[in-house]
Structure formats: structure tokens, C-alpha cells
């Protein structure tokens, strides 16, 4: 029996949904609800404001409908992912930071998609760099296990999202789906740096991550940016040891130079790819500093250091020693090889249904360690 109308009425009356109700509502939205009902539901929720328990329910519903993987790694897996939607068109900070983090020895399961409001999304710049982004889930798992980094293309891992694409486009406003991406990491990353487009989302998302089992997370909003910024103050809600604390960071407090907003602007996928390659090869400047700050945050939530500041020299060394270029080349080579295998097996991103034999590979196979 459909309950979406009941949930809409409750939201319109200003009442919060329980996590169970939110999960059930999300399941209807992704399956049987009509477009008009989806539209009304999303707008009513937006008008009321999303609460942590509602976000938790939506995330659980998304994961239930998605393709999850369980990579076997020696250390805590981390993700660097932003909501996007800040409208600032900076370079691809979280994507570059993910590669730097992996080069420093921390396994990364990067969740991402194409550009929503900026010129260049994470998958756009990776493709411009020659990295195959639309691998099947089991080959993403293998990439993470073999080289310590994998990219999880949202349409492959969350195919049910196609169901709401038309409504979201028609609405043309931010909805709860804009904040679910960073929270629905298909590899179950336990360390996360989550950038958000609105400072007021930092604490609700941190509390939601606590409920979802994340071990250490930084939910950040920096000077209008969904990253830790080097152009001004960054507001942080940190989840650690089950508790959430809030504070403000500045570039100076982390030993970095302050930059001007124009110094970190991005461009087209090709332009951003060129910038990232120059940085990976050692070019210094504000864009490199921005990437280092966010990679240091990822290293911090991985548990290998006790603070972001302690991690900055590690991130710098990963670039200066050449480790980042080695990791980048591995990433490009492995994804290219696995893409060809996928192609031979008939995998079509977003279209090919996973057979039972392929689904069984989404977690370590028999004989492998869990």
C-alpha cells in the first residue's frame, strides 16, 4: 500500500519523518510514486528542512536500491566527496585530493558523478585525464584492492536514481538528493571528508553519518565552497569517537598561505585536467595548496595522523616525491584494462543488469578474505 500521500501531508504540516518513514518514502519515490507526488514530496521536505534521522532513512533506502561493494583493504577506506552546487566553479579539488591521498598509502573509494552546476564534475575531469570511470562494481572493487583507489560512478552504483532525474531537472532547485551522494558511498567508506554547499548542513550531516556508522568524518563548508578552502574560513562539523564537534579553520591556522577566490577557479574538463597534471608533476601555487589541504583532511580521517596539520607534509611529499604521478598512471592503466574486460563481457553502464554470478563478486569471493 502506497503511503507517499501520508508522508507528504505530514511534511506539509511541518512534522518530521522517522528514519523508518523516510526510508519507506524513498523506496516509493524510486519505484511506484508518480512524478507529481515525487515533486510535491521533495518540495515539502525542502520547505520543512531535512533532519538527521530523515537523512539516515533516505541513505538506507538509497543503499538498499544500489550496488554495494566490500573491498578488502588493510586500512580504513576514505572518500572525498562534495555535494557540489556551490556555484563557484573551482578546480576538481576532491578528485585530485583522492589521488594524492591514495598515493600517500590510504585506500580511497571515490564516489562521484558528472557536473551538476559547475562546468566539470569528478567523472568529467577523470575522463579528460584518460581514466575510465564507468567500470562495473566488481572491477571497481578490484581496482581499490590492487592499487588503493577506485572511482564509483553514481549512475552505475545507484541506477534507480534515473527514476527521479526528470523531476529533479524540472524542479531546478536543490533537494535532499543533492546531499545524498556523499552519504551513500557504495564501498561503505568509514572515513569521509564531505563538502556541503550550505554551512547549515554541516551538523545535520555529521549526526547522520554517526548514525550510519561512519567512524571519522569532517563535514565542511569553506568560504562558500564545498571544500576546505584556502581563501577564507572553513566551518567544520567533525564526527570522531561517536561525538560531533564544530570549529573553524583558516589557511593560516594550518600553516598555509591565504589565496584569492580567483586563484582557484576551474574551467572545462580539458582545462582542469591540464591543471591537475601540472600540479601532480610538482607545480606550486594556490590550486596545489587547496588540493593539499583537502588531501591532508582525508589522511586525517583515515587515522594515520592526529591532525590535518600533521598530514600536510605527507600530502606534499606524495606530490614532490613523484608518488602521485605513479598512482595516477596506475589508475589510468588499471581502469583501462578492466574497462576492456567489462566490454568483452557485455557490461553497459546503467543498462546491463548484473547477473547472479557478477553480483557475487561485489564482495570478496569464496576463498578471499572478507
Curated annotation (Swiss-Prot):
Query: Which cofactors, by name?
Result: Mg(2+)
Cofactor descriptive note: Binds 2 magnesium ions per monomer.
- Which pathway does the database say it acts in? Amino-acid biosynthesis; L-tryptophan biosynthesis; L-tryptophan from chorismate: step 2/5
**Catalysed reaction, written as an equation:** N-(5-phospho-beta-D-ribosyl)anthranilate + diphosphate = 5-phospho-alpha-D-ribose 1-diphosphate + anthranilate
Q: Which InterPro entries match?
A: Anthranilate_Pribosyl_Tfrase (IPR005940), Glycosyl_Trfase_fam3 (IPR000312), Glycosyl_Trfase_fam3_N_dom (IPR017459), Glycosyl_Trfase_fam3_N_dom_sf (IPR036320), Nuc_phospho_transferase (IPR035902)
According to its UniProt record, the EC number is: 2.4.2.18
- Chloroplast as UniProt keyword: no
Keywords from the UniProt entry: Amino-acid biosynthesis, Aromatic amino acid biosynthesis, Glycosyltransferase, Magnesium, Metal-binding, Transferase, Tryptophan biosynthesis
Biological processes annotated in GO = L-tryptophan biosynthetic process
What are the recorded GO MF terms, alphabetically? anthranilate phosphoribosyltransferase activity; magnesium ion binding
**Where is anthranilate 1 annotated to bind?**
82, 113
For binding Mg(2+) 1, which residues are annotated in this chain's numbering? 94, 227
Binding-site residues, anthranilate 2: 168
- Residues that, per the record, bind Mg(2+) 2: 226-227
Specify the enzyme's EC class, one word.
transferase
All disulfide bonds of the chain are none
Residues annotated as binding 5-phospho-alpha-D-ribose 1-diphosphate = 82, 85-86, 90, 92-95, 110-118, 122
Which HAMAP family does its entry note?
Answer: TrpD
Q: Which PANTHER family does the record match to this protein?
A: ANTHRANILATE PHOSPHORIBOSYLTRANSFERASE
**How does this protein assemble?**
Homodimer.
**Per its database record, what is this protein's job?**
Catalyzes the transfer of the phosphoribosyl group of 5-phosphorylribose-1-pyrophosphate (PRPP) to anthranilate to yield N-(5'-phosphoribosyl)-anthranilate (PRA).
Stated name of the protein = Anthranilate phosphoribosyltransferase
Q: Which organism is it from?
A: Methanosarcina mazei (strain ATCC BAA-159 / DSM 3647 / Goe1 / Go1 / JCM 11833 / OCM 88) (Methanosarcina frisia)
Q: Which gene encodes it?
A: trpD
